[in-house]
């Protein structure tokens, strides 16, 4: 059936190719752009010898051609440790400034929310992280249990008979002479 359908499709395709359009409407050159109106692209010129770019500058030849950068000016020492200067360094005064203010004042130019006494800030990233971890753990446990059950059923000869038949197989394989000697004692 599939071979016949493929043959019919092939014949139909060949028939479409052989039959020419009556008005010559299908022409591949219509789909391609005309290159007659386009100017040819200019050939890139070679860089002149007086250009600043030289690959020899990248090679280290043992001497230092680069000028040494000037040392940055040293910051002035801060005369008042309670008001840190804009030297760009971090000191103990910055730490003390953050906790030394009264209520509502969190430090210099601090823009925090004003909380009442006894009110704690919520950590917004902790709860979703814990919930996500629990969901992933439960999903993993469920998928592992399902895979275990499939494997368990795969190796049973008859899944409907269960454990009852397994006990009967054990007793059938026992040696009758051993059973007789145990019963005689």
Swiss-Prot record:
The gene coding for this protein is located in the pseudoautosomal region 1 (PAR1) of X and Y chromosomes. The gene is CD99. The modification Phosphoserine is found at residue 168. Belongs to the CD99 family. Extensively O-glycosylated. GO terms for biological process: homotypic cell-cell adhesion; positive regulation of neutrophil extravasation; T cell extravasation. Residues 83-92 have a biased composition (Low complexity). InterPro entries: CD99L2 (IPR022078). Keywords: Cell adhesion, Glycoprotein, Membrane, Phosphoprotein, Signal, Transmembrane, Transmembrane helix. Residues 1-22 form the signal peptide. This is CD99 antigen. Residues 148-185 are cytoplasmic. The keyword Signal applies. Residues 51-64 have a biased composition (Acidic residues). Residues 69-82 have a biased composition (Pro residues).
